[in-house]
Amino acid sequence: YSAITTAYPQIDWPMMSKKFVEEYFGVTFNPLTTQIEGHDYLCHILDGVRHFNNVVSDLDVDMWLYISMEYFKQIPVAGEVGSSTMPHKVNPIRFENSEANVDLSNSLCVGLSNKLPKSRMQRDLSDSSSQRNLGLAFGYSLQAISETKNGLAKCVVNYDKLASDLN
Protein backbone atom coordinates (compact mmCIF):
# COMPACT_ATOMS: atom_id res chain seq x y z
CA TYR A 1 0.00 0.00 0.00
CA SER A 2 3.06 2.28 0.05
CA ALA A 3 2.47 4.27 -3.15
CA ILE A 4 -1.28 4.65 -2.77
CA THR A 5 -0.97 5.51 0.94
CA THR A 6 1.35 8.36 0.00
CA ALA A 7 -1.23 9.71 -2.46
CA TYR A 8 -4.24 9.19 -0.16
CA PRO A 9 -3.01 8.89 3.44
CA GLN A 10 -6.47 9.51 4.96
CA ILE A 11 -7.83 6.17 3.64
CA ASP A 12 -7.42 2.94 5.59
CA TRP A 13 -6.22 0.89 2.60
CA PRO A 14 -6.15 -2.53 4.26
CA MET A 15 -9.78 -2.07 5.39
CA MET A 16 -10.80 -0.61 2.01
CA SER A 17 -9.23 -3.60 0.22
CA LYS A 18 -11.01 -6.07 2.49
CA LYS A 19 -14.36 -4.34 1.99
CA PHE A 20 -13.88 -4.19 -1.79
CA VAL A 21 -13.01 -7.89 -2.13
CA GLU A 22 -15.70 -9.19 0.22
CA GLU A 23 -18.57 -6.91 -0.82
CA TYR A 24 -18.03 -6.75 -4.57
CA PHE A 25 -16.77 -10.26 -5.20
CA GLY A 26 -18.33 -12.17 -2.31
CA VAL A 27 -15.14 -14.00 -1.40
CA THR A 28 -13.05 -14.11 1.75
CA PHE A 29 -10.26 -11.56 1.82
CA ASN A 30 -6.74 -12.92 2.28
CA PRO A 31 -4.52 -10.11 3.61
CA LEU A 32 -1.35 -12.20 3.58
CA THR A 33 -0.61 -13.09 0.00
CA THR A 34 1.80 -12.29 -2.79
CA GLN A 35 0.78 -11.35 -6.32
CA ILE A 36 -1.02 -14.67 -6.65
CA GLU A 37 -3.47 -16.40 -4.33
CA GLY A 38 -1.82 -18.99 -2.14
CA HIS A 39 -2.96 -22.56 -2.54
CA ASP A 40 -2.67 -23.58 1.11
CA TYR A 41 -6.41 -24.27 1.34
CA LEU A 42 -6.16 -26.68 -1.61
CA CYS A 43 -3.25 -28.47 0.03
CA HIS A 44 -5.34 -28.96 3.19
CA ILE A 45 -8.23 -30.34 1.14
CA LEU A 46 -5.93 -32.67 -0.81
CA ASP A 47 -4.32 -33.92 2.40
CA GLY A 48 -7.79 -34.59 3.84
CA VAL A 49 -8.77 -36.54 0.72
CA ARG A 50 -5.57 -38.56 0.99
CA HIS A 51 -6.21 -39.38 4.66
CA PHE A 52 -9.76 -40.48 3.87
CA ASN A 53 -8.47 -42.52 0.92
CA ASN A 54 -6.11 -44.35 3.27
CA VAL A 55 -9.05 -45.36 5.48
CA VAL A 56 -10.86 -46.69 2.39
CA SER A 57 -7.73 -48.57 1.28
CA ASP A 58 -7.29 -50.09 4.73
CA LEU A 59 -10.89 -51.31 4.63
CA ASP A 60 -10.27 -52.74 1.13
CA VAL A 61 -7.24 -54.71 2.32
CA ASP A 62 -9.05 -55.96 5.43
CA MET A 63 -12.08 -57.07 3.41
CA TRP A 64 -9.85 -58.83 0.88
CA LEU A 65 -8.19 -60.73 3.74
CA TYR A 66 -11.51 -61.52 5.47
CA ILE A 67 -12.82 -62.89 2.18
CA SER A 68 -9.69 -65.01 1.67
CA MET A 69 -10.11 -66.36 5.24
CA GLU A 70 -13.78 -67.02 4.39
CA TYR A 71 -15.11 -64.79 7.18
CA PHE A 72 -17.14 -63.08 4.46
CA LYS A 73 -18.71 -64.67 1.41
CA GLN A 74 -19.28 -62.78 -1.79
CA ILE A 75 -22.66 -63.05 -3.41
CA PRO A 76 -22.21 -64.21 -7.00
CA VAL A 77 -23.84 -62.07 -9.66
CA ALA A 78 -25.57 -63.91 -12.50
CA GLY A 79 -23.58 -63.62 -15.71
CA GLU A 80 -20.35 -62.50 -14.04
CA VAL A 81 -17.28 -64.68 -14.49
CA GLY A 82 -14.95 -64.62 -11.50
CA SER A 83 -11.76 -65.92 -13.06
CA SER A 84 -10.62 -67.14 -16.46
CA THR A 85 -9.27 -70.34 -14.91
CA MET A 86 -12.01 -70.76 -12.29
CA PRO A 87 -15.22 -69.17 -13.62
CA HIS A 88 -17.17 -70.29 -10.53
CA LYS A 89 -14.86 -68.34 -8.19
CA VAL A 90 -15.88 -64.84 -7.10
CA ASN A 91 -12.88 -62.53 -6.90
CA PRO A 92 -12.85 -59.50 -4.57
CA ILE A 93 -12.32 -57.32 -7.64
CA ARG A 94 -14.27 -54.34 -6.29
CA PHE A 95 -11.86 -54.02 -3.36
CA GLU A 96 -8.86 -54.48 -5.65
CA ASN A 97 -10.18 -51.82 -8.05
CA SER A 98 -10.75 -49.50 -5.12
CA GLU A 99 -7.16 -49.95 -3.94
CA ALA A 100 -5.87 -49.04 -7.41
CA ASN A 101 -8.05 -45.93 -7.55
CA VAL A 102 -6.90 -44.90 -4.06
CA ASP A 103 -3.27 -45.21 -5.16
CA LEU A 104 -3.90 -43.02 -8.22
CA SER A 105 -5.82 -40.43 -6.21
CA ASN A 106 -3.18 -40.34 -3.47
CA SER A 107 -0.36 -39.95 -5.99
CA LEU A 108 -2.10 -36.94 -7.52
CA CYS A 109 -2.96 -35.48 -4.09
CA VAL A 110 0.66 -35.69 -2.95
CA GLY A 111 1.99 -34.29 -6.21
CA LEU A 112 -0.46 -31.39 -6.22
CA SER A 113 0.11 -30.65 -2.51
CA ASN A 114 3.82 -30.41 -3.22
CA LYS A 115 3.45 -28.33 -6.38
CA LEU A 116 0.70 -25.82 -5.69
CA PRO A 117 2.26 -23.78 -2.83
CA LYS A 118 5.40 -23.13 -4.90
CA SER A 119 5.75 -20.31 -7.40
CA ARG A 120 8.58 -18.80 -9.35
CA MET A 121 8.59 -15.20 -8.12
CA GLN A 122 4.78 -15.09 -8.29
CA ARG A 123 5.02 -15.12 -12.09
CA ASP A 124 4.78 -18.85 -12.60
CA LEU A 125 1.68 -20.15 -14.37
CA SER A 126 2.38 -23.85 -13.89
CA ASP A 127 -0.16 -23.93 -11.06
CA SER A 128 -2.99 -23.53 -13.58
CA SER A 129 -1.86 -26.65 -15.46
CA SER A 130 -1.55 -28.52 -12.19
CA GLN A 131 -4.99 -27.44 -11.01
CA ARG A 132 -6.54 -28.96 -14.12
CA ASN A 133 -5.76 -32.32 -12.52
CA LEU A 134 -7.72 -31.69 -9.31
CA GLY A 135 -10.74 -33.34 -10.91
CA LEU A 136 -8.71 -36.48 -11.55
CA ALA A 137 -7.58 -36.67 -7.92
CA PHE A 138 -11.15 -36.27 -6.67
CA GLY A 139 -12.55 -38.54 -9.38
CA TYR A 140 -10.23 -41.43 -8.55
CA SER A 141 -11.16 -41.00 -4.88
CA LEU A 142 -14.88 -41.09 -5.64
CA GLN A 143 -14.40 -44.13 -7.87
CA ALA A 144 -12.55 -45.89 -5.03
CA ILE A 145 -15.37 -45.14 -2.60
CA SER A 146 -17.93 -46.38 -5.11
CA GLU A 147 -16.02 -49.62 -5.71
CA THR A 148 -15.72 -50.25 -1.96
CA LYS A 149 -19.45 -49.64 -1.46
CA ASN A 150 -20.25 -52.03 -4.32
CA GLY A 151 -17.88 -54.63 -2.88
CA LEU A 152 -19.44 -54.37 0.58
CA ALA A 153 -22.92 -54.74 -0.93
CA LYS A 154 -21.85 -58.12 -2.37
CA CYS A 155 -20.59 -59.49 0.95
CA VAL A 156 -22.35 -61.47 3.65
CA VAL A 157 -20.96 -62.66 6.97
CA ASN A 158 -20.03 -66.35 7.04
CA TYR A 159 -21.31 -67.14 10.54
CA ASP A 160 -20.42 -70.84 10.25
CA LYS A 161 -16.75 -70.08 9.54
CA LEU A 162 -16.58 -67.51 12.35
CA ALA A 163 -18.16 -69.95 14.83
CA SER A 164 -15.80 -72.71 13.70
CA ASP A 165 -12.71 -70.52 14.21
CA LEU A 166 -13.92 -69.29 17.59
CA ASN A 167 -14.47 -72.84 18.91
Model-based region annotation:
Residues 1-118:
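Internal glycine-rich alpha/beta core junctions
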Residues 71, 83-167:
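Glycine-rich cofactor/substrate-binding loops
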